Swiss-Prot record:
PANTHER family for this protein: CYTOCHROME C OXIDASE ASSEMBLY PROTEIN COX15, CYTOCHROME C OXIDASE ASSEMBLY PROTEIN COX15 HOMOLOG
Subcellular location: Mitochondrion inner membrane
GO BP, sorted A to Z: cytochrome complex assembly; heme A biosynthetic process
Binding site for heme b: H329, H390
Domain of life: Eukaryota
Membrane association type: Multi-pass membrane protein
The name this protein goes by in its record: Heme A synthase COX15
Cofactor dependency: heme b
Protein source organism: Mus musculus (Mouse)
Keywords from the named record: Heme biosynthesis, Iron, Membrane, Metal-binding, Mitochondrion, Mitochondrion inner membrane, Oxidoreductase, Transmembrane, Transmembrane helix
Catalytic activity: Fe(II)-heme o + 2 A + H2O = Fe(II)-heme a + 2 AH2
Listed HAMAP family: HemeA_synth_type2
Amino acid sequence: MQRLLLPSLRALTGSRNVGLLVPRVASRTQCGSSCGSQRPLRPGQYSTITEVALQSGKGTVSLPSRAAERAVGRWLLVCSGTVAGAVILGGVTRLTESGLSMVDWHLIKEMKPPTSQEEWEAEFQKYQQFPEFKILNHDMTLAEFKFIWYMEYSHRMWGRAVGLAYILPAAYFWRKGWLNRGMKGRVLALCGLVCFQGLLGWYMVKSGLEEKPESYDIPRVSQYRLAAHLGSALVLYCASLWTSLSLLLPQHKLPETRQLLWLRRFAGGTAGLVFLTALSGAFVAGLDAGLVYNSFPKMGESWIPEDLLTFSPVLKNVFENPTMVQFDHRLLGVTSVTAITVLYFLSRRIPLPRRTKMAAVTLLALAYAQVALGISTLLMYVPTPLAATHQSGSLALLSGALWLMNELRRVPK
């Protein structure tokens, strides 16, 4: 029996030493004639700590805990990549002003695009009933409409693919028993956040389809809803990436010194600053604030422009005044790169593993590359390819910050 089972177990676990995981059996000489036949010991008495048990009733095999962790970690790493793709594609959709081309939302029905001329004409006529066509695109042709429609369609279909990438493997791993209690709660939260993200996306689009006389006759989605949509996507990305790194990368046993404690806290604060800077970019995009002052380092002829606080009450300027929004994004960007530079030099004063040092160097390089992209995007009046690259850079920078934080995390006792 053992000869029959070992090849299957080795194929599943990818280990040549699977034979060590088969339970010992009591011999007839140890238990006497009363045993009758050989009986396996209890599951807790396996010859190694990690258990591999055949469940003959269900026909499934439980992988060793480490192998299961790596499988779940790889899955979540792929999921974080799909979320990054959705964020980038959503940014391009916004930059090409395509987000309001699909004026309704159906989970299943809209998965089939128009195919005939009549269907396209009907879709175009629906779009013509809304402010964006009436005010901005009244001379748009059907061919131009097809382009922006397919941009929004691609973003929505990608979002559905992200949902499937989370939910289907989660159900599979859950059924196989490869998720412990803590991981089950985390996976449920991630899947719930994916569903919430889809609903939030439509809630955002609806704000751009409404008549808004106070919006200076420029149809656009609410910058608040845009920031919420991007923010929830970033939270989903960060949670997925952090969990995957924690499962895939061996944890360092670092000496718990005061210097390391301060470095760990500073790295966490820096990551939070990078997240806030990326989130502020949603307000820049929502208000087209990148086109207000296209000079650097000054804003026009001054360091602090005169129209910085023109709205009343004053707090309204932070979220609705394009000048203030651009000023805040600049300030957050400069503060972030300064904090990352300080973090890098602090890390050089502490003996750290090679992989941790590599994470610090990578984060520093990503920070200066992102600053260069941001300045170039500003000076060139926000061209779509460069602006999309700048948004992608924010994800890369956030990933670098999370990687370094993960390298410095405390080993549980």
